[in-house]
């Protein structure tokens, strides 16, 4: 007869484990049996390890080595509590706890260890000159920065920072603007130099202060493209007007004309800038200069434009466009006095100098009513400095001349200057007392060979209304050289 009740199969070793845990509980008599049982099986598993020992032998050895010690005083429950307590303290140390204000003191904050999981990098505001400070990301040993240091400043101006510290903006555009601001601040004290970009600058209004010295510097930057590279050439032209008061005898005028006609052959490198003598402004002098700038590369014009600059008696208005600007000077001077006009050109960026060339020196008697001076100059700036050796030929009042300096690898610069000296008395000119002076020089190119150099200046005398300003530059005429003679 078959029984209908199911038959239960007891796994091997279960009886041995239950007997072992029962003996351990009876020997140690723990307060919490559940926690003791968990610690018992955990210690048994650690004691077994990776060995393949029979469960009966394992429980027997475990009771002889471990359970006997637990009965003496150290129980697995206490061991388990000791293991859990350091884990709790380590977790609590990482989580900041809110303390009461009465117990929070500065001394506690000094000895407290702080941890930061996140580190934010910002531009160093307190960087010392010559040394850069970098923050280590993820370095828990260093204390986190204070909120004032971690919050990036909203681009403070460079002047707000003390001289001991330097602010380096993270934005490249701000860095470039800051560097340009420093450069402009360095050159701000040089009031006599005016840097103008013809393509991008806006009209500039400068108040003119009446003084005894009339000097003007104009710097024009023009890009030149050569073999796929863009080169920027800055040309600085200085124009000074020299007016002497009072009338002088004919002997002094003759001496001055003779002295001015001597060519400057001994001077190889004249100074780039000469001090303008004092000028007392009394009558009306109108000087209108026309500057024509064009770049030539391999006998092909690249950039061409005319620059006009207009100057009024009380202010200088400089309107700039892509190709045109006008200069017009109205100054006060006595109707009759000797005058000299000097124009100088230098190259600022590449530190190449173009020697100064004296265009014209006019001396007239007190009876002259007006003098019209027209000059044209064309110069090519080369890698070597130009040395001018002007000579003064004898020509009539209606003669015209030009200055032209050639080079193959240079910027072609043409300058035309018209000087009009008016007189309110309206006296007629006298042919007997006229003293024409014209100058012709040959600037010598040091280094590479250049084209033929010819220079000249035209002087026209008129008593009628002012002639119109030249609309463009005419082709320069080559004039023969000669010695200066006064007619």
Curated annotation (Swiss-Prot):
It is found in: Cytoplasm; Cytoplasm, Cytoskeleton; Cell projection, Cilium, Flagellum. Residues 78-163, 243-271, 420-487 are annotated as: Disordered. One of its GO terms (molecular function) is calcium ion binding. Gene3D superfamilies: cAMP-dependent protein kinase regulatory subunit, dimerization-anchoring domain. Residues 12-49 form the RIIa domain. Residues 78-91, 101-117 have a biased composition (Basic and acidic residues). Its main location: cytoplasm. GO terms for cellular component: cytoplasm; cytoskeleton; sperm fibrous sheath; sperm principal piece. GO terms for biological process: sperm capacitation. InterPro entries: CABYR (IPR038848), cAMP_dep_PK_reg_su_I/II_a/b (IPR003117), DD_CABYR_SP17 (IPR047579). Residues 420-436, 455-464 have a biased composition (Polar residues). Interacts with FSCB. May function as a regulator of both motility- and head-associated functions such as capacitation and the acrosome reaction. May bind calcium in vitro. This is Calcium-binding tyrosine phosphorylation-regulated protein. It comes from Macaca fascicularis.
């Amino acid at each position: 007869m078959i029984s209908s009740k199911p038959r239960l199969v007891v796994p091997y070793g279960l009886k041995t484990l239950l007997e072992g845990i029962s003996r351990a509980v009876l020997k140690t008599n723990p307060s919490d049996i559940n926690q003791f049982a968990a610690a018992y099986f955990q210690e048994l598993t650690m004691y077994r390890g990776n060995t393949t020992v029979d469960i009966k032998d394992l429980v027997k050895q475990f009771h002889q080595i471990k359970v006997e010690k637990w009965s003496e005083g150290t129980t697995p429950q206490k061991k388990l509590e000791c293991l859990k307590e350091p884990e709790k303290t380590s977790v609590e140390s990482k989580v900041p706890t809110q303390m009461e204000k009465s117990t929070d003191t500065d001394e506690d904050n000094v000895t407290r260890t702080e941890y930061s999981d996140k580190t934010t990098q910002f531009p160093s505001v307190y960087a010392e000159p010559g040394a850069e400070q970098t923050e280590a990301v993820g370095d828990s040993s260093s204390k986190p920065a204070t909120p004032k240091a971690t919050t990036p400043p909203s681009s403070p101006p460079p002047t707000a920072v003390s001289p001991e510290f330097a602010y380096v903006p993270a934005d490249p555009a701000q860095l470039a603007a800051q560097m340009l601001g420093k450069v402009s601040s360095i050159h701000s004290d040089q009031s006599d130099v005016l840097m103008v970009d013809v393509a991008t600058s806006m009209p500039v209004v400068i108040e003119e202060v009446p003084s005894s010295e009339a000097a003007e510097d104009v710097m024009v930057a023009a890009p030149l493209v050569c073999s796929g590279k863009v080169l920027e050439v800055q040309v600085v032209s200085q124009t000074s007007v020299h007016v002497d008061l009072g009338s002088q005898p004919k002997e002094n005028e003759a001496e001055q004309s003779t002295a001015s006609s001597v060519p400057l052959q001994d001077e190889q490198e004249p100074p780039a800038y000469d001090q303008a003598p004092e000028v007392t402004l009394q009558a009306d002098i109108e000087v209108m200069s026309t500057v024509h700038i064009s770049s030539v590369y391999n006998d092909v014009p690249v950039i061409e434009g005319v620059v006009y600059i207009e100057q009024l008696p009380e202010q200088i208005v400089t309107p700039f466009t892509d190709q045109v600007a006008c200069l017009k000077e109205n100054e006060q001077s006595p109707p009759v006095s000797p005058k000299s006009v000097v124009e100088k050109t230098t190259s600022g960026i590449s530190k190449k100098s173009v020697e100064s060339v004296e265009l014209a020196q006019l001396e007239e008697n007190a009876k002259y009513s007006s003098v019209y001076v027209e000059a044209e100059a064309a110069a090519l700036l080369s890698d070597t400095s130009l040395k001018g050796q002007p000579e003064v030929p004898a020509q009539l009042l209606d003669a015209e001349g030009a200055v032209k300096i050639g080079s193959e690898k240079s910027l072609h610069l043409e300058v035309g200057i018209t000087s009009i000296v008016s007189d309110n008395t309206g006296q007629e000119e006298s042919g007997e007392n006229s003293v024409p002076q014209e100058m012709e020089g040959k600037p010598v190119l040091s280094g590479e060979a250049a084209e033929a150099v010819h220079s000249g200046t035209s002087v026209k005398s008129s008593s009628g209304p002012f002639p119109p300003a030249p609309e463009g530059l005419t082709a320069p005429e080559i004039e023969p050289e000669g010695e200066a003679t006064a007619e």
